[in-house]
Amino acid sequence: MSEFSQTVPELVAWARKNDFSITLPTERLAFLMAIATLNGERLDGEMSEGELVDAFRHVSKGFEQTTETVAVRANNAINDMVRQRLLNRFTSEMADGNAIYRLTPLGIGITDYYIRQREFSTLRLSMQLSIVAQELQRAAEAAEEGGDEFHWHRNVFAPLKYSVAEIFDSIDMTQRLMDEQQHSVKEDIAALLNQDWRAAIASCEMLLSETSGTLRELQDTLEAAGDKLQANLLRIQEATIGNAGLDLVDKLVFDLQSKLDRIISWGQQAIDLWIGYDRHVHKFIRTAIDMDKNRVFAQRLRQSVQNYFDNPWALTYANADRLLDMRDEELSLRSEEVTGELPPDLEFEEFNAIREQLAAMIEQALLVYQQQKLPLNLGEVMRDYLAQYPRARHFDVARILVDQAVRLGVAEADFSGLPAEWLAINDYGAKVQAHVINKY
C-alpha cells in the first residue's frame, strides 16, 4: 500500500472489498483506551479474555451501568472490536478454548492519539530532529559517493522513505495535535469569561501564556534544524541530477522538501494566528474592565452606600497640602491682582452656598421626571445649568449635578455594556458620557 502507487479508485475498491468500518461510541472508546493502558503495563503485550472482561467492568462502573449484564456486553464489545480490526484474536488447542488478544496497528494508532501523543515534549522533538539530521547526513554522503541501483536503494532511498519521512509525519501530527489543543484552550477561555471574567483573568492569562510558549518552543526547535535539513536534501537532489534511473529518489526528496517547508511555514502561521487571538482576548478583558469601572462599579458603590448600616465599611483617603511656587520670576509673569489661595472659611462658604442653591434647583427640576417617570438626559440638563454660570464654575456645577442625578436613579442601558454617546455640555469643548436615566 505505497502512497506513490495507490490511486483514489483503487483505495475505494479496496475499502469496499474488505468492508472497513469504525464505530466507536464513548463507552467503546473508553474500553479501547483501558485495554491500551493495561496492555502497556504487560511485558508480553498480550491479554486474555478474562482480563478484557475485567477492563470492561471498570468502564461499565465508570459509566454507572448495570453489573448484571457485564459479561454479555463485554463479549459483544470484544467481538465488535475484532470485527473492526481493533483487536486481533488468537486461539489455540493448547489454551483450552481461551483466546489471546493483541491490539492491532489501528487500535494502537487510535489509542496513541488519545493517550500518548497529547503532551508536547521539546526533548522528544529535539531527539526526532537529531535522528533526522543524522539520517540525512548519511544519505547525502552516500548520494555524493554514487553507486549502483542497490546502493541508492539501500543507503539513500530506504532511510529517506522509512525513517526521515515517518519522523516528518510524526512532527506534522504533533502540529495537528497542537491545533486541536489551541481550539480546546479557546473553548476553555470562552467558558471562563462567560462564567465570571473577574475570577477568570488569571486562568486565561495562564492558558494564553502556556500555549504561546509551547508554540514558540516548537517553532524555535524546527527553525534551528530546518536550514541544515534542507541543505542535506539539496545535496541529495544535486547528486540525482542527470541520472534518469533515480527519478523515484528525486521525487521522494522533492516531497520531503515540500513537507519540511509546510511544517515550518504552518508553525509560524499558527504563532501569528495565536498572537492575534491573544490580542483579541486581552482587548476583551480591557473593555470589560473599562465597562465595569465606568458603569457597574458606580452601581455597586451606590448599593454599598445604601446598605451601609447593614454592612458597614470604612473609607480612607489622602489629601496632601498643595505646593505653591513663590519664586520672583514666576510672580512677575502673573497678571492676577491677588496670588495664593482663598481663606478656607471664605472658600467653604462660597462653595457651600452654590451647592445648596443647586441642590434646591435640581430637586425641584428633577421632581417632574421622577413623578412622571420621564427619561432624564443628563447631557441636556447639564448644558442648561452650565449656561447660567461662568466658565470658572462649570466643573463644580457639573460635579454637583451628577451627584444629584445618580441619587435619583440609574440608566438601564448601563447594564447593556454599550458605551454612551459623548454630548457637549458647554461652548468650551467640555463633554459628558452618560446614558439616559430611566429607572428611578
From Swiss-Prot:
It is found in: Cytoplasm, Nucleoid. One of its GO terms (cellular component) is nucleoid. CDD domains: MukF_C (cd16337), MukF_N (cd16335). One of its GO terms (molecular function) is calcium ion binding. Gene3D superfamilies: Chromosome partition protein MukF, middle domain, MukF, C-terminal domain, Winged helix-like DNA-binding domain superfamily/Winged helix DNA-binding domain. Residues 208-236 are annotated as: Leucine-zipper. Pfam families: KicB (PF03882), MukF_C (PF17193), MukF_M (PF17192). One of its GO terms (biological process) is chromosome segregation. Keywords: Calcium, Cell cycle, Cell division, Chromosome partition, Cytoplasm, DNA condensation. NCBIfam families: PRK05260.1. Involved in chromosome condensation, segregation and cell cycle progression. May participate in facilitating chromosome segregation by condensation DNA from both sides of a centrally located replisome during cell division. Not required for mini-F plasmid partitioning. Probably acts via its interaction with MukB and MukE. Overexpression results in anucleate cells. It has a calcium binding activity. Interacts, and probably forms a ternary complex, with MukE and MukB via its C-terminal region. The complex formation is stimulated by calcium or magnesium. It is required for an interaction between MukE and MukB. Belongs to the MukF family. This is Chromosome partition protein MukF. It comes from Yersinia enterocolitica serotype O:8 / biotype 1B (strain NCTC 13174 / 8081). The lineage of its organism: Bacteria, Pseudomonadati, Pseudomonadota, Gammaproteobacteria, Enterobacterales. The gene is mukF.
